[in-house]
């Protein structure tokens, strides 16, 4: 019942995604479709997707890691001393952490806005750790918004054969995982 897009603009890049997969489908646990879901969008600027959001959280450019780590701290019960993180007030982050821990089920879809930055691999790791932490409270999932020329098959085989989800280097004859390097 909670859908979060982070650094993604699916209204433009994946036009049918919300209609088919995330926001509008009616199902066993959310029979009312869109009316039963809340959409939160984290981005550095307004986009067509932020216009559809119930809650648009504007963050400073290149502050994804800090905001995700602050959310993670709040989910784990660690109080923040700062008044704002990445351009977002701690009060707003606290409310979002509460919303994430009390939803019945949530999903974090992340896009190139998170993964392509200077430290994109650290932002992705922070998002995945936040997702893991949220699973102590509720069902929470993280999914990457695929790029053009979908690499889902290659990712699936890499995960199956090596145990690593992406950024695998086989040059030495065995799998090495380091998303900041490869």
Where are these regions (language model features)?
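Short, structured patches in soluble enzyme cores that scaffold and shape functional sites
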Residues: 7, 43, 110-112, 146
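Conserved active-site and cofactor/substrate-binding residues in soluble primary-metabolism enzymes
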Residues: 62, 66, 88-91, 121-129
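Glycine-rich phosphate/diphosphate-binding loops that line cofactor/substrate pockets in enzymes
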Residues: 1-2, 92-107, 134
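Extended redox/cofactor-interaction regions of prokaryotic respiratory oxidoreductases
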Residues: 1-24, 30, 37, 128-182
């Amino acid at each position: 019942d909670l859908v979060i897009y982070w650094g993604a603009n699916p209204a433009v890049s994946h036009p049918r995604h919300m209609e088919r997969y995330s926001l509008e489908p009616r199902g066993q646990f959310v029979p009312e479709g869109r009316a039963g879901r809340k959409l939160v969008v984290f981005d550095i600027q307004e986009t067509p997707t932020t216009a559809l959001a119930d809650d648009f959280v504007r963050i400073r450019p290149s502050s994804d890691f800090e905001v995700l780590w602050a959310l993670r701290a709040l989910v784990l019960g660690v109080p923040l001393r700062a008044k704002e993180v990445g351009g977002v007030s701690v009060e707003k982050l606290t409310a979002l952490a509460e919303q994430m821990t009390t939803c019945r089920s949530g999903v974090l879809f992340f896009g190139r806005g998170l993964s392509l930055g200077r430290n994109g691999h650290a932002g992705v790791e922070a998002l995945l750790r936040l997702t893991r932490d949220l699973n102590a409270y509720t069902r929470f999932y993280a999914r990457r918004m695929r790029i053009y020329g979908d690499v889902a098959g290659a990712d699936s085989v890499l995960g199956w054969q090596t145990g690593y989800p992406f950024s695998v280097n086989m040059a030495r004859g065995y799998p090495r995982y380091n998303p900041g390097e490869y």
